[in-house]
Amino acid sequence: FSSNRTIGISKSNFEFFKKKIFQISKNDYWKINRIEIYTDKIDKENLLKFENNKNDLFYIIKNDELLKSLKSNLIKSKFFKKMILRNDINEESLNKKEYDLIINCDANNFLAKKYFTKKISKNYYNLAYTTILKHKKIENNTATQIFTKQGPIAFLPISNIETSIVYSMDIKNKKFDNSDVIDLINKNNPKYEINKIDKLNSFELSCSNLRNYYQKNILAFGDMLHKVHPLAGQGFNMTIRDLRILIKIIEDKIELGMQLDSLVLDEFEKKTKDKNFVFSKAIDLIYESFNLDKKVKNKSFSKILKNIGENKNLNNYFIKLADTGIN
């Protein structure tokens, strides 16, 4: 978990997190009540705008702060026991412990390599650059995304004096060094009087959907199930929605006095797999649409999106979809 990476959590997922996992300290998250989307084809003109006067749209949290809080709360929980697994651990030794269910989130261990290699995947040939801007104090509750010729850049507030940056840059035809990225951040800066730009980190971008969610009593989970482009801020939200469904299935089985076995995992796959695939493909379609738009010289596509954004019913639908996913 990089110190300059952040995640966005939708309002409904945030409420679930506080109720079922742990209370996130008010010092660790920042409220976002407005989202503005631009394209550099229509200079300084808002392409799409999402806001809810009654509620926050989502919350921004630093990855490392969330991980630190999660570890602290797990240690205090009577339901949690930390085990250090040996390097030579294998499936046979796990079976001897007779676990009802095994949930695997590690894409690099022996379980993943044996059972969870078949997936539908796509390489975006993008590098996501992340950093944090230190800037002059302003009212800072609006997230901004700009679709540039190099790729989408998101400005995600984390306080009145700090804003997280995620710049997904197309590197298929051109490579960028850190000074290029910093120049482009400054060029696309929507409103901030920048005092300092922290060290840049980067990671490759791809999307994937696992073909089979479980084998026997072993469930793949998290990024193993699905990875999506970060432009919509939905990766972690998809995982929390999966968690909500899995917890509900397990709670229902326990309440009925039923055994926790592979039937739990089968029900989970049936309730989530198709929806996750459709949702991830929708995010991919958004990326490819803007990717196509930047290659076309006229502004017609951008103007069509602007007209769609001005439709109140569609606007509200997209807000709900980003909050709760596909129901």
Describe each region flagged by the PLM.
Residues 173-263:
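FAD/FMN-dependent oxidoreductases across multiple families
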Residues 1-33:
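Glycine-rich FAD cofactor-binding loop and adjacent beta-loop-alpha segment at the N-terminus
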Residues 8-11, 51-72, 172-179, 205, ...:
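Short beta-strand to alpha-helix junction loop
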Residues 17, 70, 155:
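Residue-level signal for inorganic ion chemistry
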Residues 29-130:
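Conserved N-terminal helical subregion
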Residues 248-327:
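C-terminal helical "tail/cap" subdomain of flavin- and related membrane-associated enzymes
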Residues 105-191, 197-200:
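Conserved FAD-binding catalytic core of PHBH/FMO-like flavoproteins
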Residues 14, 63-67, 71, 126, ...:
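A general structural signal for well-ordered alpha-helical segments in protein cores
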